[in-house]
């Protein structure tokens, strides 16, 4: 059990490290463009230099599908490693583990990364919008968290089924 909990903790820290490394310049910050408040997105789209880098609008259902596929692959790899090292005793154990894993990651992303770090660090600010107040609206983050609840439930069900079959 300790190893399974450690995997979740390490994954959360790696997830945050990825967010940290993926920010710091205007170009890097464009990767997380949809996480920015709508007002910031509008200002970036009006900026002559950065508007060229702004991603096209992607539908939410498409984004959800991409997230499901990505996390099924990632959690599937982790699941196989755990199954053949520390093991799982039943389908229910696998399902509960990956439900907890996904929802802990989702909550960590909302509280630690988005609300505590992201909204307060200068790393995510665009050079032509340095004022902190532009980045304080949590709506995009909360909406993402709410979608994540469903995404990680689906991921847990799919991964559990695959792990049970293997």
For each predicted feature, which ranges?
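Juxtamembrane/disordered regions of integral membrane proteins
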Residues: 1-92, 96-166
């Amino acid at each position: 059990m300790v190893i399974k909990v450690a995997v979740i903790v390490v994954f959360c820290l790696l997830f945050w490290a990825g967010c940290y490394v993926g920010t710091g310049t205007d170009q890097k910050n464009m990767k997380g463009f949809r996480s920015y408040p709508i007002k910031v997105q509008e200002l970036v789209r009006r900026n002559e230099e950065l508007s060229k880098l702004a991603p096209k609008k992607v539908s939410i259902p498409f984004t959800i599908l991409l997230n499901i596929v990505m996390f099924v692959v990632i959690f599937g790899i982790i699941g196989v490693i755990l199954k053949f090292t520390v093991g799982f005793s039943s389908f229910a154990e696998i399902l509960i583990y990956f439900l907890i894993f996904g929802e802990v990651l989702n909550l960590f992303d909302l509280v630690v990364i988005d609300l505590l770090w992201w909204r307060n660090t200068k790393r995510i600010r665009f050079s032509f919008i340095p004022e902190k107040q532009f980045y304080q609206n949590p709506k995009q983050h909360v909406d993402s968290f709410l979608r994540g609840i469903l995404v990680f439930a689906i991921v847990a069900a799919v991964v559990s089924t695959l792990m049970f079959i293997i």
